[in-house]
């Protein structure tokens, strides 16, 4: 009898140890503002031989569902974990507490508010980051993080190949219809798509565009062209994301979407970003694109607490 019961008891014990499967009811009960389960600045084991990606999320910004930098970065970290040999490290509030994390990162990503208050441009930080660029570290900026004042943007041109320049570039909300995609590792597994976001365009690019590859392009409504530069380009196709092969051998990527947190539920949106981070870290992107499995319920995790009103769940694009 014991020979029969022992395996059954062992199975039961294992089931209890693992716990019940996550259900929709569990997701509904979960605190959407609980960020305690996201490991911060967690380094890999000493014997780790893969690629390290440092993901830096900005401070709280905008209203609920917009500029959810921490929650979006947590999602991105989970997506990157689906690629073997990649170790994402999450830092928060615009800058890592442990600056030594920069020294071992194969790629550095910033997802935060930019312009004059950009965490990257404060004090001597650009000089510190230049040292990382000089050793070939990948550089990735998402959404508002691509926005720099001209005096800082000149340096960023060498890091990322382009940036959003105030009063030159423009930042409207519009439905971008991406009809064609270039042959590039970042576009592997990505299909043409249409998605509403705050897609910036009219980027400041260098005169010498060698090494620069537009990744996402679409034709915006002419009514959104309100700067002198963009007004002169009515009907023209515009670039909303780009890759840059730097002269030093490093790689940069700029992505202007990411205003609406809900867009992480779009598979092509996720795959472009994940592929780009892998590419920037010099990880071979699979021919079918990176794995980006995602549960839409995760849109409502790790959010910043904004406002005092009743919580309204964030739904995927097109859902009501």
Model-derived features: positions:
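Bacterial N-terminal signal peptides
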Residues: 6-19
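Catalytic beta-strand/loop cores that center a nucleophilic Ser/Cys/Thr
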Residues: 31-41, 165-248
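Helical hinge/lid and interdomain linker segments adjacent to catalytic or ligand-binding clefts
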Residues: 29-34, 55, 61-141, 145-148
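Stable alpha-helical elements in mature extracytoplasmic
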Residues: 49, 72-76, 101, 125-129, ...
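A glycine-rich, often tryptophan-bearing local segment used as a flexible ligand/cofactor-contacting loop or short
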Residues: 115-192
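Extracellular ligand-binding/catalytic regions of CAZymes and related secreted enzymes
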Residues: 25-48, 75-78, 82, 222-224, ...
């Amino acid at each position: 009898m014991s020979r029969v019961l022992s395996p059954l008891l062992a199975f039961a014990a294992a089931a209890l140890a693992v716990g019940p499967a996550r259900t929709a009811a569990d997701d509904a009960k979960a605190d959407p503002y609980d960020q305690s389960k996201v490991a911060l600045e967690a380094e890999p084991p000493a014997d780790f031989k893969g690629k390290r990606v440092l993901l830096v999320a900005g401070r709280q910004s905008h209203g609920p569902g917009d500029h959810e930098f921490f929650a979006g970065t947590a999602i991105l970290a989970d997506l990157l974990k689906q690629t073997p040999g990649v170790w994402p490290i999450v830092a928060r509030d615009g800058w890592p507490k442990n600056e030594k994390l920069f020294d071992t990162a194969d790629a550095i990503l910033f997802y935060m508010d930019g312009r004059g208050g950009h965490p990257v441009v404060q004090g001597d930080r650009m000089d510190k980051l230049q040292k990382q660029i000089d050793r070939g570290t990948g550089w990735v900026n998402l959404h508002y993080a691509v926005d720099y004042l001209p005096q800082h943007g000149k340096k960023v041109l060498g890091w990322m190949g382009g940036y959003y320049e105030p009063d030159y570039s423009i930042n409207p909300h519009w439905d971008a219809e991406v009809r064609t995609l270039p042959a590039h590792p970042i576009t592997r597994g990505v299909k043409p798509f249409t998605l509403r976001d705050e897609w910036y365009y009219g980027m400041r690019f260098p005169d010498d565009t060698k090494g620069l590859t537009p990744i996402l392009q679409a034709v915006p409504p002419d009514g959104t062209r309100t700067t002198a530069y963009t007004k002169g380009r009515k009907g023209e196709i515009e670039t909303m994301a780009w890759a840059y092969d730097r002269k030093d051998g490093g790689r940069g990527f700029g992505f202007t979407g990411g205003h609406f947190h809900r867009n992480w539920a779009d598979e092509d949106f996720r795959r472009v970003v994940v592929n780009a981070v892998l590419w920037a870290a010099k990880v071979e992107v699979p021919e079918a694109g990176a794995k980006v499995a995602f549960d839409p319920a995760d849109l409502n995790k790790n959010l910043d607490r904004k406002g005092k009103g009743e919580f309204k769940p964030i739904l995927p694009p097109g859902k009501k």
